[in-house]
Regions:
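Serine-hydrolase-like catalytic core of hydrolytic proteins
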Residues: 86-274, 312-335, 397, 456, ...
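Short, solvent-exposed turn/loop segments enriched in Gly/Ser/Thr/Pro and often Arg
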Residues: 153-155, 201-205, 403-410, 464-470
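Non-catalytic accessory segments of hydrolases
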Residues: 20-171, 195, 435-448, 454-465, ...
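Short glycine-biased active-site loop of nucleotidyltransferases that positions the nucleotide triphosphate
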Residues: 139-141, 215-219, 413-419, 468-469
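Bacterial N-terminal signal peptides
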Residues: 5-16
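Substrate-gating cap/lid region and adjacent catalytic-acid/histidine neighborhood
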Residues: 238, 273-439, 448, 455
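Substrate-binding rim/cap in mid-to-C-terminal beta-strand-loop elements of soluble/periplasmic
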Residues: 158, 224-225, 232-234, 420-435, ...
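Polar, surface-exposed loop/tail segments
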Residues: 283-285, 407, 456-483
Length: 509
């Protein structure tokens, strides 16, 4: 609910700008046909609702994405395509959804017809269960980059393990993202983008997707930099029965269920009598996504995702590209939506709880819930960020860590720090919903992100110099009222939480 409210604030605040856009047509010829979009009031050309793969509905449910067929005539790219199906309890009633949903969007400066501008490919979050590619991409495009966003299959339509599937692929949503990158490689030049300078970036599940693409062989060479914002790649994922290595312990220290058993539980809730694929492909897709409890998890299937990203990073299996990652000061704000209670997570901490309470004394002094939520957020997101950034040394690639520490009193007065996904609002937000100090910080953050996409280094001459993170000790760029780089920040806390993670894996490996 919090993520939905944050996104509604963002989209409603920007609606008047989008409505004021001019209707000047802008045409482009892609590999499959002609499209026409619009040039808006900011001087940005936008193309919305471009199909990057054929419909995955009906008999193509739980199949890899298929290439787009050639189009005849001129196709309108003025409106977003439908979002992928998602639970009714979480989606806005105004959101148009359909199982036929594999569409992407492009924003590019109007002057960039023959240029080769950096390309920034945004992957939305939403727990792999909600969300879509509707963003105000013109906000970043005005900085001289080409922005791409896309929909990808969600919930059990995007992540499904079933014993009768002929392939060992379970992450169809991840394959959708690879297909979108294929489309970028083939077509982005006609929009003024450089196919040899593509940056992935995404928040939350989108950040996790970035990390998964970093270790996906099918995505190799299709992007050249990556920014994972609040990715959570250290937590255990369900495994298929034929995936290598046994299933690790889950977050509450119980043996994780197999991916097949989790998938069958969802399927039985949607259609109790179906045990084979043909009838399941005929079940209304909305029933399937409505049957998911909590978030959707990607699946370790030995193919599209060989193992948890953190384990692969530590073994040097990730792409050798410049990498930025980090999170916010109160990531634990997302805990109520995670499906893990305060008491359950406290039990997971076990004998370390007293040490952790001492390290987080100021948070526990406010309340036990605030203390546990802060620890949860740091464990889930910041431990992952530091571990993956440090592991980039195994492939001799540079990495940078960031930490947003703003108290957005004007927007969310009851937050004790910067909430989960607030950096998305900073990247794409509006002056009317954040105060002047936060607006200035947001503009600086955008400039660092764009420069990283342009050059592979987040260095802006007139702003604070940002050193790589892990040569001698942790170096975090802290975005606040005044930005600064801090060495060893959070090390005492993250060292303890990382040790817990290592013990959890050592019990089963």
């Amino acid at each position: 609910m919090y993520r939905m409210c944050l996104w509604m604030l963002l989209t409603s605040a920007l609606s008047s700008e989008l409505a004021a856009a001019s209707a000047d047509e802008s045409q482009v010829m892609t590999s499959v046909g002609h499209y026409h979009g619009v040039i808006d009031a900011t001087g940005v050309r936008s193309f919305r609702g471009i199909r990057y793969a054929e419909s995955p509905a009906g008999g193509h449910r739980w199949q890899p994405p298929r290439p787009v067929k050639k189009l005849s005539g001129m196709t309108s790219a003025m409106d977003y395509g439908p979002a992928c199906l998602q639970p009714k309890r979480a989606a806005s009633t105004a959101l148009r959804t359909d199982e036929d949903c594999l569409f992407l969007n492009v924003w590019t400066p109007a002057s960039a017809t023959r240029e080769r501008l950096p390309v920034m490919v945004w992957i939305h979050g939403g727990g792999f269960l909600t969300g879509d590619g509707r963003i105000p991409g013109e906000v970043l495009a005005t900085h001289g980059v080409v922005v791409v966003s896309m929909n990808y299959r969600l919930g059990p339509l995007g992540f499904m393990a079933h014993e009768t599937l002929k392939s060992n692929i379970a992450n169809f949503g991840l394959l959708d993202l690879v297909a979108a990158l294929d489309w970028v490689q083939e077509n982005i030049a006609v929009f003024g983008g450089d196919p040899n300078n593509v940056t992935l970036f995404g928040v939350s599940a989108g950040g996790q997707a970035v990390n998964m693409l970093m270790v996906n062989p099918q995505a190799a060479g299709k992007f050249h930099r990556a920014i994972a914002q609040s990715g959570y790649s250290t937590w255990a994922l369900p495994r298929t029965s034929d995936a290598p290595k046994p299933a690790p312990l889950s977050a509450d220290m119980r043996k994780a269920d197999s991916a097949e058993s989790i998938s069958m539980h969802v399927l039985s809730r949607a259609y109790p009598n179906a045990t084979s694929l043909p009838p399941l492909r005929e079940v209304e897709g909305q029933r399937l996504v409505d049957a998911v409890e909590g978030f959707q998890l990607p699946i370790v299937d030995g193919s599209s995702l060989p193992e948890e990203p953190a384990r692969l990073f530590l073994r040097g299996k990730q792409a050798k590209v410049p990498f930025m990652t980090g999170g916010n000061s109160f990531e634990g704000s997302v805990m109520p939506q995670s499906g893990i209670s305060v008491d359950r997570f406290a039990r997971m901490l076990g004998e370390s709880l007293s040490t952790i309470e001492s390290l987080y004394a100021s948070d526990f002094a406010i309340s036990r819930d605030i203390g546990i939520q802060r620890v949860f957020g740091d464990t889930r997101y910041l431990v992952s960020a530091r571990m993956l950034a440090t592991a980039m040394r195994t492939v001799d690639a540079p990495a940078w860590l960031y930490y947003v520490d703003l108290a957005p009193e004007q927007l969310l007065p009851r937050m004790v720090g910067t909430p989960h996904a607030f950096d998305q609002l900073m990247l794409f937000g509006s002056d009317r919903i954040i105060n002047e100090s936060t607006r200035r910080t947001s503009e600086r953050l955008r400039r660092y992100w764009v420069e990283f996409a342009r050059s592979g280094q987040p260095g802006v001459p007139e702003l604070t110099s940002w050193a790589t993170c892990c040569i001698n000790q942790d170096q975090w760029m802290v975005f606040g009222v005044n930005d600064d780089v801090r060495s060893g920040m959070l090390s005492d806390k993250l060292d303890v939480l990382t040790e817990l993670y290592q013990k959890r894996w050592a019990t089963v490996h």
